[in-house]
C-alpha cells in the first residue's frame, strides 16, 4: 500500500482509491483527492488533471457565490435591524424576500455556471472512456 500525505494531516492514504474530504469552509464542496497510480499513463494523467481542474473550478465558483451570499445577507440583516430596532429579529418572510432577490440577481451567473458545468463534464466523457479501456486491458494482462 502506497501513501500520499494530505496537506491537512499526516494520514496514510490507500492510493488505490479516490478520497473525499470534509466540506470546504467557503465553497461547502468536498475536496476529492483523486488516486494516482504508480504506473499512470499520460492519458490517465491528463484525465486526472482535467478532473482536478474541474473540481477546483467548481469549488472556486461556489466559494465566490457563497461569500457574496453571506456578505449580502449580512448587509440585508443589518439594514433590516436598523429599520426595526436592534432588539428585533429579521423574520423568515423578510429573509425569504432576500433569498428570492439574491437568486433573481444571480440568475444569469447561475445559468452560465450550469452551462459551463455541463460543457466541462460532457468533455470528460470521451477521455474517461479511453482511460477505462486502458485500465481494462491493464487488468486483463495481470
Curated annotation (Swiss-Prot):
InterPro entries: COA8 (IPR018796). It is a peripheral membrane protein. One of its GO terms (cellular component) is mitochondrion. Disulfide bonds: none annotated. Keywords: Apoptosis, Membrane, Mitochondrion, Mitochondrion inner membrane, Transit peptide. GO terms for biological process: intrinsic apoptotic signaling pathway. Coiled coil: none annotated. May be required for cytochrome c complex (COX) assembly and function, COX being the terminal component of the mitochondrial respiratory chain. This is COA8 family protein Y39B6A.34, mitochondrial. It comes from Caenorhabditis elegans.
Amino acid at each position: 500500500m502506497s501513501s500520499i500525505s494530505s496537506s491537512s494531516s499526516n494520514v496514510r492514504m490507500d492510493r488505490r482509491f479516490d478520497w473525499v474530504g470534509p466540506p470546504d469552509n467557503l465553497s461547502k464542496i468536498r475536496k476529492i483527492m483523486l488516486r494516482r497510480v504508480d504506473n499512470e499513463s499520460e492519458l490517465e494523467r491528463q484525465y486526472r488533471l482535467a478532473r482536478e481542474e474541474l473540481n477546483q473550478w467548481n469549488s472556486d465558483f461556489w466559494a465566490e457565490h457563497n461569500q457574496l451570499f453571506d456578505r449580502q445577507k449580512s448587509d440585508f440583516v443589518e439594514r433590516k435591524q436598523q429599520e426595526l430596532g436592534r432588539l428585533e429579529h429579521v423574520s423568515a418572510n423578510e429573509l425569504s424576500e432576500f433569498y428570492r432577490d439574491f437568486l433573481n440577481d444571480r440568475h444569469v451567473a447561475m445559468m452560465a455556471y450550469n452551462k459551463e458545468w455541463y460543457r466541462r463534464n460532457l468533455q470528460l466523457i470521451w477521455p474517461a472512456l479511453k482511460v477505462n479501456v486502458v485500465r481494462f486491458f491493464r487488468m486483463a494482462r495481470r
